[in-house]
Regions:
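Mature catalytic domains of secreted/periplasmic carbohydrate-active enzymes
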Residues: 27-402
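Bacterial N-terminal signal peptides
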Residues: 11-21
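Residues at the start of alpha-helices and the adjacent loop-to-helix junctions
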Residues: 6-8, 18, 115, 163
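Bacterial N-terminal signal peptides that target proteins for export
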Residues: 1-12
Length: 402
């Protein structure tokens, strides 16, 4: 694509945003601006310089917009435990819920309205081009049929269905690329998963397993993390992204072994930077947007509400205007937006979130040419390209470059 065409298309998208939202100044719904690269580097380390590109990322870089899904036992609690509040997916940590009680909570997990085909259809209506679904979050509960650990949706709940498997199949039927999230270094169900936060015991299960010094990450890695990743690769052949989190105590050798294993079973699969130790194919700033262009491929993961998992009291979702502004801002800097929804305990998406995303989808139906398949100009944030009489295109106003 010629750079001037990219600039014109982004100008048309910006004009459409004025019609959609009414106000010219950017609004970000509480998303932090300008700290993306720094934040990602502090948590996970920058990608190693000079490492050749491992896989073809063009489809992902053309997509620019994906759906992130967080669902687990925390969904049932909905941000409240025995009258006390707790932050969505962190309800177990916030309230120090014992493992035994979480296993009882699994008996209440029964999202009978779950329809994988409708989830994929909703993403398509929203203009999203790929889906990443949580397969295991920090509570250690697997959303797929895991032979190596019975604490999973098929064996431990009355629902008894493989949510990852059904969603993977629906994505394949509808031509939607599919990826899975996996919490690599944090597991509150496992006695060997130590804290990977700055302070000892900071985000590990120190109420059931108080002796941090007795915990051995390599035992957990060999017993659960590596076997479950292998299960995902073998059971769901259309996985195209493995989206790790909390690499924590992963050694360089363990991170590399994980990458080698994925490459063996799924050669084209993309891997994010949270596999740890400066490895991976793209960086993943969280709840932030880059302050400028980045030489590494990058993707901002951002919630549409206040938390990653479903919360009963979360009724304020980012408006269509804010989502569209975030998307165009990110695309103008060469990134992707992975927008998160927390499905309800019944297996549906919150109605207000769906309505807002449908509106963004309609906007993309008209303006998608300015988003999909684009690449950034040498600088971002230019104003409209000026058209001269006779059809000749004039240069942008240098005073209007941010």
């Amino acid at each position: 694509m010629k750079p001037i065409m990219m600039m014109r298309k982004m100008g048309l998208a910006a004009m459409a945003l004025l019609l959609l939202g009414g106000n010219a100044p950017a609004q970000t719904g509480g998303v932090r601006q300008g700290a993306a690269q720094k934040d990602a580097a502090q948590q996970y380390g920058p990608l190693r310089p000079g490492v050749p590109q491992r896989v073809d990322m063009q489809w992902w870089q053309d997509s620019h917009y994906g759906l992130f899904l967080h669902m687990g036992l925390y969904t049932v609690a909905g941000g409240e435990w025995k009258g006390k509040g707790g932050f969505g997916e962190f309800i177990q940590l916030n309230n120090k819920i014992p493992v035994a009680e979480m296993r009882e909570e699994a008996k209440r997990f029964n999202p009978v309205q779950f329809d994988a085909n409708e989830w994929v259809a909703a993403a398509r209506r929203a203009g999203m081009k790929y889906i990443v679904m949580g397969s295991k979050h920090h509570e250690g509960f697997a959303m797929f049929d895991s032979p190596c650990n019975d604490f999973n949706v098929v064996k431990a709940t009355p629902f008894g269905r493989d949510i990852i498997g059904e969603l993977a199949a629906a994505c394949q039927r509808q031509g939607m690329p599919f990826g899975v999230y996996y919490s690599l270094g944090r597991d509150w169900d496992d006695p060997d998963c130590p804290s990977n936060w700055p302070r000892e015991g900071g985000r590990s299960n120190d109420w059931d397993y108080p002796n941090e010094r007795a915990k051995e990450f390599s035992r957990y890695f060999e017993r659960k993390a590596m076997p479950q990743v292998l299960e995902l690769l073998r059971q769901y052949p259309n996985i195209s992204i493995l989206w790790f989190d909390t690499p924590g105590y992963c050694s360089p050798e363990q991170s590399q072994r994980m990458i080698d294993t994925i490459q063996k079973y799924r050669p084209g699969c993309l891997i994010n930077d949270r596999v740890g130790n400066g490895l991976g194919d793209f960086i993943t700033p969280e709840q932030t947007v880059s302050g400028g262009l980045d030489p590494d491929p990058w993707e901002s993961c951002i919630t549409i509400g206040s938390s990653w998992g479903y919360t009963k009291r979360d009724t304020v979702f980012k408006s269509p205007e804010i989502v569209a502004r975030l998307l165009t801002d990110i695309v103008s800097k060469g990134g992707n937006l992975l927008l998160n929804i927390g499905p309800t305990p019944w297996g549906t998406f919150p109605e207000k979130a769906v309505a807002n995303l449908d509106a963004v989808g309609r906007w993309l139906g008209t303006n998608g040419e300015a988003v999909y398949g684009t690449r950034p100009w040498r600088v971002y944030g230019e104003s409209f390209v000026r058209e001269k009489i006779g059809g000749k295109t004039g240069a942008e106003n240098p005073d209007e470059v941010k």
